[in-house]
Amino acid sequence: MVAPGCSVPGLWVRGFGQCLGSLFTLFSKPLCSAAAAASQPLDAQRLAERLRAQKQQQKTKEPAPTNPVQRRVRELVRFTEQLQRVHPNVLAKALSRGIVHQDKELVVINKPYGLPVHGGPGVKLCISDVLPVLAKILHGPKAKPLHLCHRLDKETTGVMVLAWEKEVAHQVQELFRTRQVTKKYWAITVRVPVPEAGVVDIPIVEKEAQGQQHHHKMTLSPSYRMDDGKMVRVRSSRNAQLAVTQYQVLSSSLSAALLELQPITGIKHQLRVHMSFGLDCPILGDHKYSDWNRLAPQKLSAGILKKLGLQQSKARHLPLHLHACQLTLPALQPQKEELTLLCRPPRYFVNSLRRLGLKMPSRDHSADEEAAQPGAQ
């Protein structure tokens, strides 16, 4: 409580690392008596503005990292934050610059990192919000909105298919549902799987993790277990879903590998769960599935941290290295041929490959080419 005309430069807010008030400053002003302080309400708006300004000043005072990797990680974090704050027109224009295919039926974009496909709690802007604007950019002001044909996780980059007509979108969705679409992903994993090629065929179910932080995760629900050297069938959860993933190591070093993943089924977080819990090779930057009991930044070995030029305390900003690199659609009409769509990985993905000593196959993508579409990070 402060009397009119009394400035309180020492006011600070306690709670969440900020301060609530300085009594010494409050009583050091002769005009700021206790009676006057009790008579007027505090201007909450001015206090909030002051706190925001102080917080912004603290951010600007933080020294810029000299390490190029840490600098790029910070830039990526800021880029994803900006994606949630930009005007829908700006986001739609950025997506239009990342188009990899367009015809009378479909539009295919290279989805950037950190952008959700659908809305939800805490989501300020998503791809579905800007589809009407994107359609107008491509086909003029009278264009009807584009339609989503499938989804990718917020942290996953790469091929994403949109349709001009709702009927075509339903047709493509049915192709996904009946597993007629061939999907290929690239993933950088922590450690190298053994064997280097194979199939992970383990059902997946969602469960609550009983740790310090109660949360839900997808996890394995095996149909068999080993008992005295023998494989014994077990009763699986009624909620478990069939999940099958083909994988192959494309390049490897002592501590990491580049994998090509081909999901045969399409279960939520299937690739992340199979890599982490099935092969014990979590995807680089997967802070959710690197540990079952905790929600914590991924813990990396000293060797990987050294190659990436990161400290463990900064690992929480490391993005998920999972990229939808290729998608093959069957012919939508009898007179047409199947459509194979390719997307180059984002810049941070290519940089991590180089630092970890991993090679990107030249038959699909050239490492010497520009790593990302215009506007992608």
Swiss-Prot record:
UniProt region (Disordered), positions on chain:
51-70
- Entry keyword annotation includes Isomerase: yes
Keywords from UniProt, A to Z, are:
Cytoplasm, Isomerase, Mitochondrion, mRNA processing, mRNA splicing, Nucleus, rRNA processing, Transit peptide, tRNA processing
E.C. no: 5.4.99.-
**Molecular function per GO:** RNA binding; tRNA pseudouridine synthase activity
Instruction: List all membrane-crossing ranges.
Output: none
Question: Would you tell me the Gene Ontology cellular component terms?
Answer: mitochondrial matrix; nucleus
Q: Which SUPFAM superfamilies match?
A: Pseudouridine synthase (SSF55120)
| GO biological process, any | rRNA processing
Highest taxon of the source? Eukaryota
Cell compartments where the protein resides: Mitochondrion matrix; Nucleus; Cytoplasm
**How is this protein organized at the quaternary level?**
Interacts with 16S mt-rRNA, mt-tRNA(Phe) and mt-tRNA(Met). Forms a regulatory protein-RNA complex, consisting of RCC1L, NGRN, RPUSD3, RPUSD4, TRUB2, FASTKD2 and 16S mt-rRNA.
Instruction: Please give the function described in this protein's UniProt entry.
Output: Catalyzes uridine to pseudouridine isomerization (pseudouridylation) of different mitochondrial RNA substrates. Acts on position 1397 in 16S mitochondrial ribosomal RNA (16S mt-rRNA). This modification is required for the assembly of 16S mt-rRNA into a functional mitochondrial ribosome. As a component of a functional protein-RNA module, consisting of RCC1L, NGRN, RPUSD3, RPUSD4, TRUB2, FASTKD2 and 16S mt-rRNA, controls 16S mt-rRNA abundance and is required for intra-mitochondrial translation. Acts on position 39 in mitochondrial tRNA(Phe).
Which protein are we looking at? Pseudouridylate synthase RPUSD4, mitochondrial
- Organism this protein belongs to: Bos taurus (Bovine)
